[in-house]
Regions:
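Extracellular/oxidizing-compartment recognition motifs
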Residues: 1-395, 404, 420-423, 436-439, ...
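Active-site core of glycosidic bond-cleaving carbohydrate-active enzymes
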Residues: 400-711
Length: 711
């Protein structure tokens, strides 16, 4: 039953609800009295009042559900008539960020408890400004489309109530929607100014390139990865930008108020790696084209806009006049290269940050510069990745990954004392009636997301159960365990056919993921992977505790003993066994992370394996010598380094924990002001799980309820 809207119904332009990358504007004129806007939309929206940006959204939900935002418009209103514009882009492609669902907007404005404008009654006009270029490449494999626009200065009048050259369209009512309340807080959209210009120079266009880099999101468009095929694109953004030749002339400038460009570029630096909507004002006496290229770091002193396999290059064709540019979706960057073909003046370069509000608690840190820098970086990392659910990264994917969420959830409780985002995140897994393209019982590795290729990570589904137990302990929400019971037992039922004669999971399907290291290599994760089975035993134990199931508890205990007997070689736990004609044989693969799994999952403890424990504590970690245990492959940040630090914390080795923490994270905090996916800047440089650093610091030093000054 719809309890969120009194009159509004979902609408879209007639015949266009399934159109890919379709941007429309919905406009209403209201009086200047207190007003509240309620809306839900697919895929993403932004709201303007009298030409000024108000907010963007929505919060994401499971397939077939849509969360409703309630926005107070009163502060933006003036006396007399006011123009409210809601822009919505419907992507209609599968991704890990937004769902492949038809475009719609349901919106109504309440004033004095009465509806003064509502979609479906004619008070919201539907328009196409014909500025967004639809046929562009995907932004990444995990996200929908990159951005390219043909902006006309006259159309800015549309946001103030004039015609502006927009085409009014006939609307039609869409299928009825199921609505949910937005439980997570609205972002605050704090502006972040460019700090300085790090390089300027000239640029030549259309310079032949020997070998163009082309990502799968560009070349593999089809039923499994929806988008516009390369031969149908209006703009080939990544190809075009690879034909630019840069000639640096100046390497630094402090004045960023106005940047004059003519067939030239300027590379700007933000104070830290940030996520949000990139904004600027561009004035040009004649038509010109502006390109925005960006990344989280500089690679060999320059912006590599394809480093993360994203298309971090957007294009704006501008006519003569003044243009206010704002990206429609949020992006992540520390470095922005602005290039102009033709002449223009660029000013007011800034980002409207799209992140969780400032946390309620801060950590009572000692006066240590390194710890403060790490904590500040961790807070930024958390805020950028905990908006409406727990994301892996705010850049390439913006996806709600399991396992990552186990760690980020601890940070939320440390910083806010609540589990609001975690509940919304976990609830999405329960709301879905089924997970299309996945086998019965299996949970998606990230959600809400579309997995048309049928891929999943069996390990990550197990982490759902581990997080479920911690969520219930943190929140006291025991009813949630009952809501999740069918999911948990469905998962256990899924794994049952993979148990071999020893009770070990063997030859699991799809992406068996241990961590980003040698432990993930194909010859290590199959056929019987011991870290995976350690996790399985822990999952069974937790399910047994949650639901009072003694059979699961007994099964877990037996499995742990089997792993100890078959994996441990007298010095280390080995990673796997392979099935041969003679049965299971151990090839002797050993990884550092396997040892951490053993201790974290309860397979091992320091009482039974004291020598191994001392080796891990004293010889491994960030200070590990190059010639130390050469047969043991090193761990990476995700998740080995974090399991190591957690084990040190649980063992009460605070001094050692802080020492390792500084060695791991100081280089990250100093370089980007955020914490990374890997121990090197080879992937995402703002990864949500990395904020778990704050959990340990909060446990060690305590927290106090105050505005966090370092974010």
């Amino acid at each position: 039953m719809n309890t969120f809207f009194q009159k509004a119904v979902p609408i879209w332009a007639k015949g266009r609800a399934d159109e890919m990358n379709c941007e429309l504007a919905f406009r209403a004129i209201i009086a200047g009295q207190d007003a509240s806007l309620h809306l839900a939309a697919s895929s993403i929206y932004r709201v303007w009042v009298n030409g000024k940006f108000v907010c963007a959204g929505p919060a994401r939900a499971a397939h077939g559900f849509y969360r409703v935002d309630e926005i107070d418009l009163t502060p933006q209103l003036c006396a007399g008539q006011n123009t409210v514009v809601i822009e919505v882009t419907a992507f209609n492609v599968n991704s890990y960020d937004t769902l492949d669902q038809p475009g719609f907007l349901t919106a109504e404005i309440l004033q004095n408890h009465a509806v003064t404008a509502a979609t479906g009654d004619g008070s919201f006009g539907v328009y196409d400004l014909h500025q967004r270029i639809q046929r562009v490449q995907r932004y990444s494999f995990q996200r929908a489309f990159a951005e390219a626009y043909r902006l006309r200065a006259c159309k800015q009048a549309f946001y103030l109530g004039s015609d502006g050259g927009a085409e009014r369209l006939e609307s039609e009512t869409q299928a009825e929607k199921r609505y949910l309340r937005r439980e997570t807080p609205m972002p605050q959209f704090e502006p972040l100014q460019v700090q300085r210009i790090v390089q300027t120079g000239s640029v030549s266009f259309d310079v032949p390139c020997d070998a163009l880099r082309k990502d799968r999101a560009y070349t593999q468009i089809g039923p499994m990865l929806k988008g516009y095929p390369a031969d149908t694109l209006e703009e080939h953004l990544s190809d075009e930008a690879q034909t630019f030749a840069w000639k640096p002339s100046c390497h630094a400038a402090e004045d960023t108020a106005q940047i004059t460009l003519e067939n030239s570029y300027a590379t700007c630096r933000f104070p830290y790696n940030a996520t949000g909507f990139l904004c600027m004002t561009v004035e040009c006496a004649q038509a010109c084209t502006v390109y925005l290229l960006f990344d989280e770091i500089l690679t060999d002193g320059d912006v590599d806009f394809l480093r993360l396999t994203n298309c971090n290059c957007f294009k704006y064709d501008l006519d003569a006049g003044t243009h206010r540019i704002m990206t429609f979706a949020p992006y992540t960057m520390m470095y922005l290269k602005i290039a102009a073909k033709g002449a223009c003046r660029v000013s007011e370069v800034r980002m409207l940050q799209y992140q969780h509000p400032a946390p309620e608690f801060q950590i009572r840190l000692p006066e240590q510069k390194q710890l403060r820098e790490i904590a500040d970086a961790a807070v930024r990392t958390y805020r950028q990745n905990a908006l409406d659910l727990f994301m892996d990264c705010p850049s390439r994917e913006r996806a709600g990954w399991l396992c990552d969420s186990f760690f980020t959830a601890r940070t939320e409780h440390a910083l806010t004392g609540q589990c609001t985002v975690e509940k919304a995140f976990l609830e999405n897994f329960l709301l879905a009636e089924r997970f299309a393209h996945l086998p019965d019982g299996m949970l998606p590795m990230c959600y809400p997301a579309d997995h048309y290729d049928g891929n999943f990570i069996p390990n990550w589904a197990m982490w759902f159960v581990l997080e479920l137990e911690e969520y219930i302990k943190r929140s006291g929400d025991c009813a949630f365990a009952e809501r999740a019971k069918s999911r948990v037992y469905g998962l256990i039922q899924y794994f049952a056919p993979f148990e071999n004669e020893y009770g070990l999971l063997e030859k699991l399907e799809k992406w068996v993921f241990v961590e980003w290291s040698r432990a993930n290599d194909p010859d290590v994760v199959q056929d019987v992977n011991f870290p995976t089975n350690m996790l399985y035993a822990r999952m069974l134990q937790i399910a047994g505790r949650l639901y009072g199931d003694s059979a699961l508890l007994e099964k877990s205990q037996k499995l742990q003993e089997t792993i100890r007997q078959r994996s441990f070689n007298g010095l280390f736990f080995t990673d796997n066994e392979r099935r041969t004609a003679h049965g299971l044989e151990n090839p002797g693969n050993i990884t550092e992370v396997c040892q951490y799994y053993a201790f974290f999952m309860g397979t091992a403890d320091k009482r039974i394996y004291p020598e191994l424990w001392q080796t891990l504590v004293q010889k491994f970690g960030p200070h590990r010598a190059a010639d130390c245990c050469p047969d043991v492959a090193p761990a990476n940040a995700f998740i080995g380094d974090y399991l190591r630090l957690e084990l040190l914390y649980l063992d009460g080795q605070t001094e050692k924990l802080l020492q390792d923490l500084k060695e791991y994270f100081t280089p990250m905090a100093e370089r980007t002001g955020t914490l990374w996916e890997h121990d090197q800047p080879s992937a995402s440089c703002c990864h949500g799980f990395a904020s778990h650093v704050l959990y340990w610091l909060a446990k060690i030093y305590g927290t106090e309820k105050t505005q966090y000054a370092g974010a």
